[in-house]
């Protein structure tokens, strides 16, 4: 894991000192710059930046919400007999912590998707949802979304992250042993895979620098460029973002927590959208992690 539990803690202890240096450099040399973070553990990285330089203009971007919007679009196509539903047309209210984020509302062109999602789960819980021509066992990052489905049945909201991340927050249920992981049909990224992936990336970087390979400019599905355009005043964008809860966008979490909600991006401005309260059950699941973030940061 890279967010919660022992794996998240160790990664945080490695990463926080580097983010202290980054925050100090921004404070000293570019205090008015916008800082976009994509590094995990997301909440702690953003929290460190603000801890060192409270006036920093920083936010964290994560694509897990996009993946859940895509899942809802695909389920809606199957259940409603529609085609070509764009991920961007799935309107959601986002609230939670990064990688433990939830939707309490989701719709497509005015159609409430909660009943649609519920019906799909009732009829496909055991096999889950597998994308076309993609066997979950063949991919490190694949999942059949059964953890999401189980959490929906337990708590009534849509968990909006990959199953391998959601499982980090509830290890006794989903990470008990390899057999348990296999039964929930999600993959884990191993140390061996990470090392091999890094090797491939470094080799590719060398080829790009030498000119042996050309840079291919293709859309990645991330929204970073759109957000930069909005901050430059060229457009207005609403997207999910990780920033401190200082505006009380989630009232029943501490204002010191870094939370994930929607926000409005416009010229030199990020305005968090009021997301509302978490249910008490889900809040109790999150509070230990909020407290852990405080402890990890202050123990450095």
Language model features: what each stretch is:
Residues 21, 25, 48, 67, ...:
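Alpha-helical scaffold segments in soluble metabolic enzymes
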Residues 38-109, 114:
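Rossmann-fold dinucleotide-binding core
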């Amino acid at each position: 894991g890279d967010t919660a539990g022992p794996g998240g803690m160790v990664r945080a202890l490695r990463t926080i000192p580097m983010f202290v240096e980054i925050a100090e450099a921004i404070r000293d040399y570019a205090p008015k710059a916008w800082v976009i973070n994509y590094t995990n553990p997301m909440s702690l990285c953003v929290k460190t930046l603000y801890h060192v330089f409270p006036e920093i203009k920083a936010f964290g971007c994560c694509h897990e919400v996009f993946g859940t919007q895509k899942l809802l679009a695909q389920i809606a196509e199957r259940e409603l007999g529609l085609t070509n539903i764009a991920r961007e047309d799935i309107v959601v209210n986002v609230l939670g912590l990064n990688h433990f984020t939830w939707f309490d509302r989701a719709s497509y062109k005015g159609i409430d998707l909660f009943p649609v999602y519920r019906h799909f789960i009732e009829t496909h819980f055991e096999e889950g949802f597998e994308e076309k021509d993609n066997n979950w066992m063949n991919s490190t990052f694949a999942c059949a979304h059964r953890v999401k489905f189980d959490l929906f049945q337990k708590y009534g909201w849509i968990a909006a992250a990959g199953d391998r991340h959601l499982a980090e927050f509830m290890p006794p249920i989903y990470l008990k042993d390899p057999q348990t992981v296999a039964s929930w049909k999600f993959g884990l990224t191993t140390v061996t895979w990470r090392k091999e992936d890094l090797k491939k990336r470094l080799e590719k970087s060398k080829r790009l620098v030498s000119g042996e390979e050309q840079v291919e400019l293709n859309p990645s599905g991330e929204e970073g460029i759109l957000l930069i355009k909005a901050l430059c005043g060229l457009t207005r964008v609403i997207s999910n973002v990780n920033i401190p809860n200082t505006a009380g966008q989630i009232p029943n979490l501490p204002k010191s927590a870094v939370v994930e909600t929607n926000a409005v991006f416009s010229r030199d401005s990020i305005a968090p959208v009021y997301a509302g309260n978490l249910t008490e059950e889900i809040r109790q699941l999150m509070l230990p992690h909020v407290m852990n973030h405080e402890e990890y940061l202050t123990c450095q």
